Amino acid sequence: MPKTNSSAASTNANPSSLQQHTPMMQQYLKIKAEHPDILLFYRMGDFYELFFDDAKKAAELLDISLTARGKSGGNAIPMAGVPYHAVENYLARLVKMGQSVAIVEQVGDPATSKGPVERKVQRIVTPGTVSDEALLNDKQDSILAAVFCPTQKANQELIFGYATLDVTSGRFTLCELSGEEALAAELQRTNPVELLYPDDFAYSHLINQRKGLRRRPQWEFDLQTATNQLTSQFGTNELSGFGVQNHQVGICAAGCVMQYIKDTQRSALPHIDRIVLESHNDTVVMDAATRRNLELTFNLSGGIENTLASILDKTSTPMGSRLLQRWIHRPLTDVTVLKKRQRNIQGLMESPYTQLQSALKKIGDMQRVLARLALRSARPRDFARLRQAFALLPDIQHYLEHEISHTSESAQPSDLLHLAEKISQYPDFADLLERAVIEAPPVLIRDGGVIKEGYNEELDRLRELSKGATDYLEELELREKERTGIASLKVGYNRVHGYFIEVSRSQSDLVPVEYVRRQTLKNNERYIIPELKEHEDNVLSSQSRSLALEKRLYDELFDLLLPQLTQLMQSADALAELDVLTNLAERAESLDYHRPELCPQSGIHFSQGRHPVVEQVSDAPFIANPINVNPDRRMLVITGPNMGGKSTYMRQTALIVLMAYIGSYIPAQDAQIGPIDRIFTRIGASDDLASGRSTFMVEMTETANILNNATANSLVLMDEIGRGTSTYDGLSLAWACAEYLATKLQSFTLFATHYFELTGLADALPELANVHLDAVEHGESIRFMHAVQDGAANKSYGLQVAQLAGVPKLVVQAAKRKLHELETGDISKQGRQETSPVNTVYATEKVETQLDLLSQTSEAEDLLHSIQPDDLTPKQALDYLYQLKKLVR
């Protein structure tokens, strides 16, 4: 089974022998026994301490000191700790590593406690349940997921139940997936930060590389238990109102999620008020390999640079950024929805949308603020953000209702007006927060200073008592100096001893009899008098009552806002959607994207197609290329040199199609794109050492998935099939796969290969065409043209690419001789050279490496001699100019 990434449950102490420990350690061990699988942060004064195995693990993960405290069984008890004021930083690091932490706070009063101060677990922080701003990545969803697979009967289809919850937005979904590939794809799409699975889960190989794994008892996946959990949360008698009642395997997974979130949050969850059945019938399906190879939101190294999302995402709000990523990972097949998005984008492009972006930037992450409101964990600055958002909503609504509908002839007003209605306005809430919360509140309510003056008369009165303390103390000090004649007399205060009258020791014999000594210092004596004691009681009482009242008023803000939580969440969702649409309008205008036509007829056609990522990160001008596949031309066999652009051309086609199916404009012109149900890629491969699979096995597994699942409406990218085995095996497999895709499946396929024998398929199969990316040789160098042309390439230029890569010239020259032998048939059928073993390709080293320096010309000269100026387009001429600049550097 997979590791759970949790703290070891064992410690060096046996809870059954608690009596050998101090009372404090007994208390710790009892609490730890209730949370054996997670780290326990145990509050002691100004630190959170960890003991035993927790201390060892925390010291390693957080790079903090490991010390010792007391003994257990004759051995020192390992201990580590972090200061309470910096705990959020440490929690953020642990959550990022997939760890969970139980926070134990002191809840008793040390002054009245007999024995250790009472402590309780106040919150449990896990990767999938955190809502604190400091612990979250604001541009990525924080998904808690559960997977369940019932015991399979003979010949029964393999079904997985999969449920996800984003506690920071309340979005709760379930689905049922057929087979391992479907589950792998869904895990890749949703990328949960925490994954729950039953302790008898039989498919550990699908999840054991993930962080944040949590093994759960089987009873949490019981159907009746799960149903009860869900109906209890939603306040319903059954689940039929959500349309999920027939998806029992998915319900089992969702029930586990709900049980876990209740166990960890220990509070009401009013924003989780529904569950949505996710169907893949209305989406363009992509498997895990495709999502990875296309580098949608993460590149092949796991970073976020040079991905499709990094180019498309210039959103104004974090919630808009997260929604855009969900759109990218879930392209739709519903053309009605997609055309509506296109109309909205066009309407925004024809309006002064920068005003809208400025307003949205000030809105911030309203979704997550509202989630903290629902969990009653919102902080003072969250209320300040809500106040600012409420103040901006009227301007945004006015913009949607007037600026766009009056200036745009393209967008149907009802499209964006519907968003305006969902955004709504909350003038009462705006007024409430304006009156209640100060302009720049502190981070926490703990020490008060949040509620604005004038909001509550009693609070103002109590605060005045505290403020008046300074005037009174100054007056008392002057009065006592005059009365006693002691010039050094001062009135002061500290938190330990309270208020006091301080007199230098040399004048202490002058103090009146009613002065009662409170503290003796080296050079001074401190006293208290009845009048000052009475003032102290009044002030401290007023401060205590003021803070208690302020906290009560703060809690009342939750009570006043929460009844409208559902509508507020709908407003936040609408703002996120508006942000994405505005962002796509800006991207289309800034990056010269065009509106594609989504057609009912099969096929993919566009001109001047560009790779959305490569064109932005490349220094050289990007060479745009067309594509045309249709029912009469379903497969393109693509040949050409390595580095010639074959993979870029294939990927750009898939990305352009995907962008069209999220409703975006695309980096291509004259686009007509027909129905697409799936996108498959078989591009690149590496060993899967963890599963014991070779590169070739990975390649064949991905190929098998394509051949078993592709349809006539699928887009398939196949790159270098068969290269991981012998030449004849590889060629045979590539030939058979190409023929099967073209004739049996009839998928729209881009098939890149270096097996030039495959180009002969075009003579036998009318639905197959050859295209190539050309290159031009200049002496010893090569220049890649990157332009797609009809017909097959005449060679692969592998030796020239090897030379560019820095392979020693001696090796390249030897390879050229061997290539000549192979091409002229100087190798026997057995593959042995008809010469002495000593007569190798390096035998003529002395002759061949003797260079004629005088006869050599520069690469720049060779290139200039090869150019025919009258045949060049302006674009090609500019291209040559860039190439010449590189050569003369």
Curated annotation (Swiss-Prot):
User: What gene codes for this chain?
Assistant: mutS
Q: Which Gene3D superfamilies match?
A: 1.10.1420.10, 6.10.140.430, DNA repair protein MutS, domain I, MutS, connector domain, P-loop containing nucleotide triphosphate hydrolases
PROSITE patterns, sorted: DNA_MISMATCH_REPAIR_2
One Pfam family for this entry, by name?
MutS_I
The UniProt record lists the keyword Transmembrane: no
Compositional bias segments (type: Low complexity): 1-17
What family does the entry list? Belongs to the DNA mismatch repair MutS family.
Q: Which positions in this protein are listed as binding ATP?
A: G640, P641, N642, M643, G644, G645, K646, S647
Source organism (scientific name): Pseudoalteromonas atlantica (strain T6c / ATCC BAA-1087)
| Keyword set, alphabetical order | ATP-binding, DNA damage, DNA repair, DNA-binding, Nucleotide-binding
Q: Which HAMAP family match?
A: MutS
Region Disordered, as annotated, extends over: 1-20
Biological role stated in the UniProt entry: This protein is involved in the repair of mismatches in DNA. It is possible that it carries out the mismatch recognition step. This protein has a weak ATPase activity.
The record's CDD domains line, in alphabetical order, gives: ABC_MutS1
Q: Name one GO biological process term.
A: mismatch repair
Protein name per the record? DNA mismatch repair protein MutS
Q: Which GO terms describe its cellular component?
A: cytosol
Is Nucleotide-binding found in the keyword set?
yes
Q: Name one GO molecular function term.
A: ATP binding
